[in-house]
Amino acid sequence: MSGIALRRRREQAQRRRSIAGVLAAVGGGTALGLAAPPTGWGVLVWVALVPLLVYLRAEHRPRAFWLGTLAGMVYYAILLRWLLGFHPLTWLGIEWWPSLAIALGAWLFVSASQAWVIGLWASLVVRTRLSGLRRVLFAVGLWVGLHWLWGQGETAFPWGTLAQSLAGDLWAVQTVALGGAQLLVGLAVAVNALVAESWSTRRVGYAGLAALLAASVYLYGWWQLAQPLPAGEPLRMGVIQGNIAQARKWTPDGRRETVETYVRGYEELAAAGAQLVLTPETAFPFIWSRPTNPAAPLVPEIQSRRVPVLLSAFERRTDGQVATTLFALDGDARTISTFNKIHLVPFGEQIPLKALIGPLVRKLSPVQQEVFAGSLGQRLQTPVGLVAAGICFDSAFADGFRAQVAAGARLLVQSTNDAWYGPAMAPQHHALDALRAVETGRYLVRASNNGTSAVVDPLGRTTRITGWNVYAAFVEPVRLLEGMTLYALWGDWFVPLSAALALLGLIAGRSPAGRRGRRNF
């Protein structure tokens, strides 16, 4: 064969490999996107990474990074399509075409900011040149560690974890009570990596280990679901979903409509026997404690009906900054405790690179004051006892709810306003609520401005859920529970453990004995 023909065959083979790599990345990213709500084909989580992992065994590092990033970009673009629901922003004074550009830019930017983490993971997995169980341990520890680190700090956006896609799988999700969402994520990555090793090496032992691991997850879930729920003090919880359009909510007429809607909802729930009422995030879009409170008509209703309320509005500090706050009002309409939103939405409520992009971001928000974040040590005392609270983005972070439950909270409440976004966001947010309920072994009650509002029991089962973009006011029985899950006691113990196992696999693979033993693993 001539040199030209040989070179041509090599080029054709390389082209085929390149196409195969792109297909593996796009296919894996698409599978992850379909696994997430609202499609909710969660079973795909257990195999979605297999094509990419198989392909990466023979791929060099720079290309591995771009293929991993491509897989992540496809995944997050599907997952975060609800960001396009920002458009149109004409009610904020932004023209139609610039509004569309802002929505598209936000969608692509946030997707890319998450996708590169998968690219880095793929690159490092390839760079280590590990194989067998060492590769599996390293892949698991690295995935868990990188995503945990990226979930820290002001710009953290821990949305779209593999556990979130498995939240609707009642057998699988029980695992999070043992080690939180990160444990379930690690198990899913381990199954993917073991299947990929089996495929690449043609050794059925790895597939057997993967099947054993997955079976253990589901057997534990089956056993847990067969147990009766613990007894606890019963509580009739009322929820109001006002369904006030975002474009109208911030106008003078809209504020009057808001007050009328929530006063009516409160009256309905009090008449239906509610013992505690929850409103959505900023249900009352103004400073609650100012002397001329626009929500004054609600106060005599509370004093007459004597049903306490967890009411969300703004709270202002002496320095002029405001917080998104839950006010615990007793039967006399007195504020007995408050909870300020802990995790502010990046590029919305808190602004990285403030000097550079601050003016633009403020133009996109109806709240013009500086927003301050609450502390992790907050405790919301209510007339029914200590309650673990979260507001909007807080439910993406397990640490706040866990800390409050460890301090004695017997119920979780989540107050949110998802009216900014498209309909795909609501089921994803609801999946986070299910994770938080199972992690802590508590009922979770969620109130959303436009849906969905829901009640989730300690096993992740939804006992009540509303529609999207509808008004709703309902009463649902829950129980105030005590006792601690392993996760509530120990937190994210799996994160350092997986990091240690990854390091162990890396060290073993680098040692002379480890290099000699690669053929046997």
Curated annotation (Swiss-Prot):
Principal place of residence: membrane
EC number: 2.3.1.269
InterPro entries linked: Apolipo_AcylTrfase, C-N_Hydrolase, C-N_Hydrolase_sf, LNT_N
Location of the active site: 281 (proton acceptor), 341, 392 (nucleophile)
Occurrences of domain CN hydrolase (ranges): 240-480
The family this protein is said to belong to: Belongs to the CN hydrolase family. Apolipoprotein N-acyltransferase subfamily.
Biological process, per Gene Ontology: lipoprotein biosynthetic process
TM spans (from-to): 34-54, 64-84, 100-120, 137-157, 176-196, 206-226, 488-508
UniProt function note: Catalyzes the phospholipid dependent N-acylation of the N-terminal cysteine of apolipoprotein, the last step in lipoprotein maturation.
EC class name: transferase
Identification of the protein by name: Apolipoprotein N-acyltransferase
SUPFAM superfamilies named in the record: Carbon-nitrogen hydrolase (SSF56317)
Keywords on record: Acyltransferase, Cell inner membrane, Cell membrane, Membrane, Transferase, Transmembrane, Transmembrane helix
Entry keyword annotation includes Ribosomal protein: no
Pathway assigned in UniProt: Protein modification; lipoprotein biosynthesis (N-acyl transfer)
GO molecular function, one term: N-acyltransferase activity
Keyword Transmembrane helix annotated: yes
Gene3D superfamilies linked: Carbon-nitrogen hydrolase (3.60.110.10)
This protein's GO CC annotations: plasma membrane
Record-linked CDD domains: ALP_N-acyl_transferase
Membrane-topology annotation of the record: Multi-pass membrane protein
Subcellular location(s) per record: Cell inner membrane
PROSITE patterns: CN_HYDROLASE
Organism from which the protein derives: Gloeobacter violaceus (strain ATCC 29082 / PCC 7421)
Entry-linked NCBIfam families: lnt
